[in-house]
């Protein structure tokens, strides 16, 4: 690694001096990150960029599999080489449909971990930490482990999916550099100006009369409809939960005890009270509503509940070979999102 650095410095130093009859210099480097730790990778990248800025007659073209370098170079300097239907394509991200503002947002957002999406065959974008913790476990339960299918899961910490969807799509082509799924909430009943609005102050032990009717008759949010319309093709697909992630999980009867166990792990006093109230209710929708409202009202511990549920599901996955009486059921919209970015196993529908 150090020998390569010395050699690269010598070559670029030589190029920086103008020579008679030579007007342009192109420096081609294959995987300069080889044998270098991340800090040195960043150092050599800055060295390249500084030389290019100081000497207009030098152009550096390098190939790389390093998320460290990709995260620092800037989206407009990235050319993706990808394969689709047994053909190779080149996609300069500068040609994407991203606005300058969206490019700036992505450059600030794409750290070393998230930049791994550029090397993936498939990408799943999620809203927050709960989904980021649990989706990999759900994928294992349906025999689609994400690592086996080269799928990267990206937590965008919000609902600003549009720049990512636009970046994935290659302008003028019906393909993208990867298949992508967006898993998000449809956020119905969130508009204060609509009669179906559900107050943010509502908790699980309040009077819930009429709330289920609001959810049943509520319409997906404008934000959800916008991202669904932007996707609308086979490159990036949007998969939405009815209301929220937690509510959708709890709508499956098998999942109630799993969720209550996870909640009781995090809330040893309040959890049993919730369990008693949920178990006394006959309506599956009301059970799901209580669980969602409980988690929503204690938002600061959502990640802890997800971690507790993740540990429970890991045990279920390990015990699957012995048979599980009431296995956790992955909601259909999440299964569809995972299937979208993974190849179906031969002869297996689910």
Describe the function of each predicted region.
Residues 3, 30-36, 67:
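Catalytic acidic motif of RecA-like/P-loop NTPases
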Residues 11-19, 50-54, 141-144:
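Conserved helix-loop functional segments at active or binding sites
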Residues 21, 34-38, 42, 72:
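Conserved D-loop-proximal element of ABC-family nucleotide-binding domains
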Residues 23-25, 55-61:
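Loop/turn-to-beta-strand initiation segments
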Residues 73-350:
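Acidic, divalent-metal-binding catalytic cores of TOPRIM
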């Amino acid at each position: 690694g150090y020998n390569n650095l010395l050699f690269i410095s010598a070559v670029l130093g030589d190029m920086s001096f103008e020579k008679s009859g030579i007007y342009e210099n192109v420096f081609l480097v294959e995987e300069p990150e080889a044998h270098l730790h991340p800090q040195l990778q960043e150092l050599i990248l800055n060295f390249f960029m500084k030389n290019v800025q100081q000497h207009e007659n030098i152009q550096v073209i390098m190939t790389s599999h390093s998320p460290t370098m990709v995260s620092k170079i800037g989206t407009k300097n990235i050319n993706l080489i990808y394969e689709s239907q047994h053909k190779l394509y080149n996609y300069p991200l500068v040609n994407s449909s991203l606005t300058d503002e969206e490019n700036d947002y992505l450059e600030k957002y794409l750290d070393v971990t998230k930049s791994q999406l550029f090397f993936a065959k498939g990408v799943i974008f999620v809203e927050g930490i709960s989904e980021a913790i649990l989706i990999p476990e759900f994928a294992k339960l349906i025999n689609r482990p994400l690592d086996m299918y080269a799928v990267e899961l990206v937590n965008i910490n919000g609902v600003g999916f549009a720049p990512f969807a636009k970046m994935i799509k290659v302008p003028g082509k019906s393909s993208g550099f990867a298949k992508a799924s967006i898993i998000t909430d449809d956020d119905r009943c969130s508009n204060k100006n609509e009669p179906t609005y559900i107050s943010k102050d509502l908790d699980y032990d309040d009077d819930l009369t009429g709330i289920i009717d609001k959810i049943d008759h509520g319409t997906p949010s404008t934000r959800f409809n916008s991202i669904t319309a932007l996707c609308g093709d086979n490159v990036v697909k949007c998969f939405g939960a009815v209301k929220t992630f937690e509510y959708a999980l709890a709508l499956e009867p098998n999942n109630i005890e799993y969720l209550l166990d996870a909640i009781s792990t995090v809330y040893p006093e309040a959890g049993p009270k919730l369990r008693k109230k949920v178990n006394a209710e006959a309506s599956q929708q009301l059970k799901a509503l209580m669980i969602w409202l409980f988690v929503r009202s204690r938002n600061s511990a959502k990640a802890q509940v997800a971690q507790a549920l993740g540990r429970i599901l890991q045990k279920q996955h390990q015990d699957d070979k012995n048979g599980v009486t009431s296995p956790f059921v992955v909601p259909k919209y999440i299964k569809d999102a995972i299937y979208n970015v993974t190849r179906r196993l031969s002869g297996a529908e689910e």
